[in-house]
Amino acid sequence: MVDAIVATFADDALVNDAHREFWGIEAIRRWAARELAGDRVTIAVTEVLDHHGDTIVRGRYDGNYDKTNLPDELILTNYFSIRDGKIVTLMVIRNTPASY
């Protein structure tokens, strides 16, 4: 599973997940092994949008990760930038609705 995930990223890609940066393919491999495969994360996609060539994917996350202070239904937004068929940037963000 980890090899398949990592194969979608460029060698110098950036992942930002929970305000942490993972630069380069080896850091992304460690992130995917520990936090996706290791925590058995599943994502049920709820929305996919194209925004000026970038892809935005919203989904319900579940898995064996620490859910302390998280809502029962965790929706995260994933912002993908893709160049030459590879992910160059992935930002994983827990958004909240604007109050105005």
Task: Walk through the language-model features, giving the residues of each.
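Short, well-ordered alpha-helical segments enriched in acidic and aromatic residues
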Residues: 1-12
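Alpha-helical elements of Rossmann-like donor-binding domains used by nucleotide-donor carbohydrate transfer enzymes
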Residues: 4, 27-30
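A short gly/proline-enriched turn/hairpin at secondary-structure junctions
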Residues: 12-23, 34
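A beta-strand edge to alpha-helix "cap/lid" segment located at domain peripheries
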Residues: 29-100
